[in-house]
């Protein structure tokens, strides 16, 4: 039985010239700005033009592009290996055809083996859904598994990506059974992976004082939450499970939210305000980006460059995103297997 796992993620500009069209695609999404056309179109044009220069400066600091695609490719490779790891049926090999830009082929697997191939589909920049569905259709799987790389479900991320895939899959005639994994905020391996990383950095931070652990999640407008979006509740549940797993007596911790844009009210407290509070209290900070599973501008620039300057030298311990952490890959593989 052939299975296609499609990793759904945000995407990011692959060059400075891609910054404005990337921003336009983001703000033109009806799940981001819920206005009818042509109003949404013209507003997306206006916002992307207005924000382009600042966004370009951000990406200039990290090599002129977003690293999210490269990071997601590594995750796809690791997941594909894990899903096919124990399948060895015959020493003969099967040819899978030419390598495609937006999927990672498995080389030489037994003719009678179950084959799973992992594809990458980005929402706002290449590889787009209309590109990836062609590769999936050519692969001709018996089953498609949609796996968003957003731990906590939100209509602005998870649902947007799923709807976009479904629209293109229907257009290109993908008719096989499709299963959807909507979140993994409470997955045991996901929780344990974070707990292990916190423990390591907490010990380092303890050398200069009693640390405060900040769980930093991408913020959302309160208007989205008030409509029933479960994102904030799932962030809180993720953190509660991690704190419980840590078994650290009298742990000082807080949830905070980053990357707010625009004048409307967003989830609070902000990561910046919590860092300022930690500075005033004179405590070292262990910061975990809880809603990100790969590095991009919000972690590499916002957390590592801008916010780091708030805290005294030697008092800031930023935990890396899970990326290809073995427990995280195990988490993703388990989600695929249990949904099969």
Swiss-Prot record:
Residues annotated to bind Fe cation: 218, 298
Pathway membership, UniProt: Porphyrin-containing compound metabolism; protoheme biosynthesis; protoheme from protoporphyrin-IX: step 1/1
Chief location bin: cytoplasm
Documented EC number(s): 4.98.1.1
BP GO annotations: heme biosynthetic process
Superkingdom, taxonomy of origin: Bacteria
A molecular function GO annotation: ferrochelatase activity
Compartments it resides in: Cytoplasm
Reactions this protein catalyses: heme b + 2 H(+) = protoporphyrin IX + Fe(2+)
Keywords, comma-separated and alphabetical: Cytoplasm, Heme biosynthesis, Iron, Lyase, Metal-binding, Porphyrin biosynthesis
Pfam families (alphabetical): Ferrochelatase
Gene Ontology cellular-component terms listed: cytoplasm
InterPro entries: Ferrochelatase (IPR001015), Ferrochelatase_AS (IPR019772), Ferrochelatase_C (IPR033644), Ferrochelatase_N (IPR033659)
Keyword presence, Lyase: yes
Family per similarity comment: Belongs to the ferrochelatase family.
Function: Catalyzes the ferrous insertion into protoporphyrin IX.
Protein name (Swiss-Prot/TrEMBL): Ferrochelatase
């Amino acid at each position: 039985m052939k299975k296609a796992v499609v990793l759904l993620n945000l995407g990011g500009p692959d060059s400075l010239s891609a910054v404005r069209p990337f921003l336009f695609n983001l703000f033109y999404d009806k799940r981001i700005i819920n206005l009818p056309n042509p109003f949404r179109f013209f507003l997306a044009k206006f916002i992307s033009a207005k924000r382009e220069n600042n966004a370009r400066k951000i990406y200039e600091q990290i090599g002129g592009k977003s690293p999210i695609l490269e990071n997601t490719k590594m995750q796809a490779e690791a997941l594909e290996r894990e899903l096919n790891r124990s399948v060895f049926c015959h020493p003969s090999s099967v040819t899978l055809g030419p390598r495609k830009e937006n999927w990672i082929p498995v080389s030489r697997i037994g003719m009678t083996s179950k084959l799973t191939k992992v594809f990458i589909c980005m929402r706002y920049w290449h590889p787009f859904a209309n590109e990836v569905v062609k590769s999936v259709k050519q692969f001709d799987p018996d089953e498609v598994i949609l796996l968003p790389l957003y731990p906590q479900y939100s209509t602005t991320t998870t649902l947007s990506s799923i709807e976009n895939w479904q629209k293109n899959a229907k257009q290109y005639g993908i008719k096989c059974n499709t299963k959807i994994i909507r979140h993994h905020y409470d997955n045991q391996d996901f929780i344990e992976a974070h707990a292990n990383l916190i423990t390591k950095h907490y010990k380092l931070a303890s050398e200069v004082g009693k640390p405060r652990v900040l769980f930093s999640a991408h913020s959302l407008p309160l208007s989205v939450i008030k409509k029933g979006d479960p994102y904030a509740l799932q962030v809180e549940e993720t953190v509660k499970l991690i704190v419980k797993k840590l078994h650290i007596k009298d742990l000082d911790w807080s949830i905070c939210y980053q990357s707010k844009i625009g004048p409307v009210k967003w989830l609070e407290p902000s990561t910046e305000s919590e860092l300022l509070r930690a500075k005033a209290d004179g405590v070292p900070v262990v910061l975990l980006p809880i809603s990100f599973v790969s590095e991009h501008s919000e972690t590499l620039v916002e957390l590592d460059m801008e916010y780091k300057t708030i805290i005294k030298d030697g008092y800031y311990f930023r935990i890396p995103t899970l990326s290809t952490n073995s427990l995280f890959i195990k988490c993703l593989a388990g989600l695929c297997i249990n949904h099969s």
